[in-house]
Amino acid sequence: MQHRPGIAIVAGLALVAFFGACGGGSDPAQTPAPSALCASSALPSGAADTTIAVAGWPDRDYDLVLPASHACGTPIAVMVVLHGGGSNKEGMRKLTCPEGDLTSARCLYRIAGAAGMAVVFANGTNAPGGQLINANGVRTFDAGGGQNGFICVSGYACTRGVDDIAYVRALLADLATRIDVDPKRVFATGFSNGAAMAQRLACQAADAFAAVAPVSGENQFALAGCDPARPVAVLDIHGTLDACWPYAGGEGGCIDSGLYVSVADTLAGWAARNGCVPAPHATELPPIAGANDGTSVVRLDYDDCDAGGELVHLEVVGNGHFWPRGYAYASGTLVGGVMSLQLDTGQAVVDFFAGHGRP
């Protein structure tokens, strides 16, 4: 495994190529005691490797990244990261790094590590052969949809009806046997299909997640109803020129075609569920020096939300279907707009999560 100073990596066996995101069960008797595994995986050299399989979910292991400074036995915040449709956990790690440089201090997992968070890169369902979105080595999550002409997001996992809520719960249960998870500080972020999956987690797993931060993917699952057990804080990020998941909703898609839920409908839904004043107030964020790409960021804040249910939207004007200040995996001709450099997405996500643990 590549040496990553300051961070310990716990990686699964599957090492598959990044295709551009539009994205065997464990034997409990052989599961290491939490303190032993934590101690072995938190080496400052980052040299400790192990396979973390999810019981009952063969071929869906996950990568765990721990801050090297983490002390075993100390409760730690956890960020679950969900890749886009047509990608995988390795691709998502690259996507969230500037220019795809895994050594950059501005990678999402490195920013989170500096803030003392454990990062989990989850893996969707792998479909054998077929179209690009279902090709071997690229994966999807069942993020909902499929009603009244709205696309079922996304691909093979959706058509198979994979229970990805159960998968994520099983992943968290497994993780809790290995490190001391702080149950009040469990968060989820994702891109595209993974963003829509994060939205679904807020609907159906509000007992487990304190906050979510979807990027370039809206709440398609709400078409079937969304009734969270308690308020979940939401940071929603989306580019106005996204050609894959149009900001205004409607027909879109880089690969799969069909109707997509709009940003406005998603935000209105969360405002109602979280008891917020429905009309937000807008603030244009100051530009980042040297990032002269013609894009800008407008922050929408919703007032008077229920406790634990803060709602914020970052409208990235001119951004296409990209993780802003990440890896430009495709041309704007295909996915719309440009990749904005006016938002440090990783920092925005980590800062939001840091302020939204449950009381």
Residue ranges and their predicted role:
Residues 22-78, 86, 104-106, 111-118, ...:
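A domain-start/cap signature at the N-terminus of enzymes
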Residues 210-307, 318:
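The feature captures the conserved acid-bearing segment of alpha/beta-hydrolase catalytic domains
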